[in-house]
Amino acid sequence: MSSHSDPIGDLAAAISRVLEGRTITELTRLSGGASRETWRFAVDGEPLIIQRQRSGDTRDMEVEASVLRAAAVAGVPVPRLVISGRFDEGARYIIQSWVEGETIARKILRDDVYASARRSLVGQFATALAAVHSIPIDDVAGLPATDQMAQYRQSLDDLNAQLDQAHPAFELAFRWLEGNRPASARRTVVHGDFRLGNVMVGPDGLRAVLDWELAHIGDPMEDLGWLCVRAWRFGSERPVAGLGTREALLAGYEAASGSPADPDALRWWEVLGTLKWGIMCMLQASAHLLGFSRSHELAAIGRRVCENEYDIMLALEGRWSTLGVA
């Protein structure tokens, strides 16, 4: 048996098998995260994209595929799902249509070609999120339903025990969040990571909502609050993705969804989103600090923890009376 290894050829052959023997050309790797790889290829001149699951990832890509199908039916702009399943060697995959456009936030926020898009994106985001939240929960069996605050409270406690660090700004945020949690009777499908970087944008505006692997059942205001987190403004002072105002986002969402959108709930989820991102930065940095995965990139992410502490203080400004702080 030959010891020759051809990963690209092997992947092309695997894709060809699931596409009934079609010829695969132009197979090019685009990215490779911790849990999945992304490749572009063509079949009969049509550009497609495949995401292949890495070993060790416990998330079910079939659930993600079912969300994509339901999202398309609900009117969410998403890439067309071609096929999903499991390769012979066991790795799960999703193949989708290629959507032309830009995902890099700084280009979307600054390049002249997107000037017209910038004027319409907040409204388009509101409409897209209203469609996401209209997906019938029964159509997407298998989505987790977790208490986000409890999950990240436990994560911070575990990190504090391992790293022996103090993060008083995070504790302040938890204290405020616990005392001001909004009452919400709505439970919907939530995208879980809706922001610049996870949407495809063209000169005409929003073209597709991408990256559904964190979808879950929760409060729909979570998606709107995450979109307002300061880290996702990429240097712009405009609070909604660096593009517009919270008032415009809420008005557009109410018009598209027919459901009231509480500005206080939006702020609550914005604070929680900022806290979550800070703890997520800690989690990534801890992999380096604890020796699990030595990486300059992971170590550098650790410096963003203090940025999020600062962002939390800004987000809580003017709310000290609810904390009992003079």
PLM segments and residue spans:
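ATP-binding pocket architecture of kinase catalytic cores
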Residues: 28-172, 182-186
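Conserved N-terminal boundary motif of the eukaryotic protein kinase catalytic domain
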Residues: 21-28
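Catalytic-loop of the protein kinase fold
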Residues: 189-191, 196
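Juxta-kinase regulatory segment immediately upstream of eukaryotic protein kinase catalytic domains
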Residues: 1-20
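Conserved protein kinase catalytic-loop anchor
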Residues: 187-189, 207
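Activation of the activation-loop gatekeeper triad in protein kinase-fold domains
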Residues: 210-215
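Active-site activation/catalytic loop segments of kinase-like enzymes and analogous catalytic loops
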Residues: 222-258, 272-291
